[in-house]
Amino acid sequence: MTKPTFFVEEDKILANLFEEGLNNLHLYKPGSSPMYSERLLTLLGEEWSSKTTVHNHFYLKEEYKLRGIHIDDAYTEPPTGYRGNLSRTCHAISELKEAKRNSGYVFLHPVFDSQTNKEETSNFTIEELKEASRQGLIDKKVYALGGINLNNIKQIRDLGFGGVVICGDLWNRFDIHNEFDYKELLVHFTRLKKAIE
C-alpha cells in the first residue's frame, strides 16, 4: 500500500517494487486531489496498471485500466453500475463472512498495532484470530493489514491469511524529505516477500 501522501520519486520506487515482485499495489491517498493520482499513474505507465487498485477517485479504474477498486469499510456500496474487481476493508471479524461474499478479497484491519500511528492499536487478540481461522473466516481471501513486519509475518502465514498488506514497515525505511537512495527499502521488501512465501 502506498504512503498516504505523494512524494518525489514515488513512481520510481513503486516501479522498482513491481520489478522486485509486488503483485498488487493499493493506491491509498485519502483526501487528495485526483489530479495527483492521475499524475502518479501516468508516471507509472501502463505496464503496472493491471496490478494497481485504487482506494478513491474510482473513475481512475476505467481511465487507467486498473486492476480494481477498494472500499475502505465493509458496508459502503460500490459505485452504481460498477462491474469489476472489488476489495474492501473489514474492521471486525464479524464483517468477514458477508464482505468476502461480495468482494474478491478483503483486508482485516488492524491485525497488529500500527508502526506509524501509535493511536491505532490491534482490534484482535491472537486467540480471536486463531478461532476465526478455525471457523474458516480467515482464509485465502483475507489479507492482514496493520503492523505487519518481519517479526510477525510468519504468524500471519500460520493463521491462514491469504496475504499481507505492508505499509509502515516498508515506508518507514525511507525518509521522503531527505533521501534519494531507496535501496534499503527494496532490500527490505525482498526480505518481507521471502518471509511470506
Where are these regions (language model features)?
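Paired acidic/hydrophobic, glycine-rich loop segments that form the ligand-binding mouth/hinge
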Residues: 69, 164-165
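Non-cysteine beta-strand/loop elements that form the S-adenosyl-L-methionine
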Residues: 104-112, 167
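A short acidic, helix-capping loop that chelates divalent metal ions and anchors anionic groups
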Residues: 113-119, 172-175
